[in-house]
Curated annotation (Swiss-Prot):
Alphabetized Pfam families for the sequence: Troponin
Functional note: Troponin T is the tropomyosin-binding subunit of troponin, the thin filament regulatory complex which confers calcium-sensitivity to striated muscle actomyosin ATPase activity.
Biased composition (Basic and acidic residues): 63-75, 114-156, 184-193
Any one GO BP annotation for this protein: regulation of muscle contraction
Cellular component GO terms, alphabetical: troponin complex
UniProt key word Transport: no
Positions of post-translational Phosphoserine modification: S2, S91, S162, S169, S170, S206
Organism: Mus musculus
Keyword field: Acetylation, Muscle protein, Phosphoprotein
Superkingdom to which the source organism belongs: Eukaryota
Protein name as catalogued: Troponin T, fast skeletal muscle
Family under the similarity heading: Belongs to the troponin T family.
Tissue and organ expression note: Expressed predominantly in skeletal muscle.
Lineage of producing organism: Eukaryota, Metazoa, Chordata, Craniata, Vertebrata
């Protein structure tokens, strides 16, 4: 028997029960205010009830050739409830699985963003180190050029002073001694700078520490620029002193040549 036929039988059965209940309610007597009238009314109603035929209860119509299996109906209802419950459970687990997948995807996106941020910080640090490396290379190149220039100047001084004779031997010795001291000091400075110049490792630093490190580097760069300016002024003074010394040497050489020419003229005059 199909579900539709079963539902039709149940609805028909319920409608007949409701009709019987309405008939019983219509036949119920109303109470009277006077006791005698109530008794008479009850007797009259009893007589009418005896005379009136009672309604016959009829069983629900069942299609011929088929029987209603209430166990089957109850089983189908249970199966329907079970299927609905199983559907709710499946939908709950599907929603839970979807939430877990979204959470895993969110974690993966967060890790990916962290890796990208770390890579960007590393690239930024490398770009920031490039100007520093260029400054260091430029400084080393300038120092090397200055050393070559000083060596050439020293050679020129030696040649100029060697023509002046033994009077300037002590001066050359002192100049060599000073130059040796300067060279030693320069080598010591290079060694100290090489020891102080350490690789900059900032990959593990946080934002606050990076700001502190940047401020520290800025202060160091500012101090280096200040020292550079002071050394430049000192170099200018030294160049001025060297120029003054050269002019004095040239004047001394001129006076010595004039004195030698005068002495030769006197000797020649005597022999004549």
């Amino acid at each position: 028997m199909s579900d539709e036929e079963t539902e039709q039988v149940e609805e028909q059965y319920e409608e007949e029960e409701e009709a019987q209940e309405e008939e019983v309610q219509e036949e119920a007597p109303e109470p009277e205010e006077v006791q005698e009238d109530a008794v008479a009314e009850e007797e009259r109603e009893e007589d009418e009830e005896e005379e009136k035929p009672r309604p016959k209860l009829t069983a629900p119509k069942i299609p011929e050739g088929e029987k209603v299996d209430f166990d089957d109906i109850q089983k189908k209802r249970q199966n329907k409830d079970l299927m609905e419950l199983q559907a709710l459970i499946d939908s709950h687990f599907e929603a839970r699985k979807k939430e877990e997948e979204e959470l895993i995807a969110l974690k993966e996106r967060i890790e990916k963003r962290r890796a990208e941020r770390a890579e960007q910080q590393r690239i930024r640090a490398e770009k920031e180190r490039e100007p520093q490396n260029r400054l260091a290379e430029e400084k080393a190149r300038r120092e090397e050029e200055d050393a070559k220039r000083r060596a050439e100047d020293d050679m020129k001084k030696k040649k100029a002073l060697s023509s002046m004779g033994a009077n300037y031997s002590s001066y050359l010795a002192k100049a060599d001694q000073k130059r040796g001291k300067k060279q030693t000091a320069r080598e010591m400075k290079k060694k100290i700078l090489a020891e102080r110049r350490k690789p900059l490792n900032i990959d593990h630093l946080s934002d606050d520490k990076l700001r502190d490190k940047a401020k520290e580097l800025w202060d160091t760069l500012y101090q280096l620029e200040t020292d550079k300016f002071e050394f430049g002024e000192k170099l200018k003074r030294q160049k001025y002193d060297i120029t003054t010394l050269r002019s004095r040497i040239d004047q001394a050489q001129k006076h010595s040549k004039k004195a030698g020419a005068t002495a030769k003229g006197k000797v020649g005059g005597r022999w004549k």
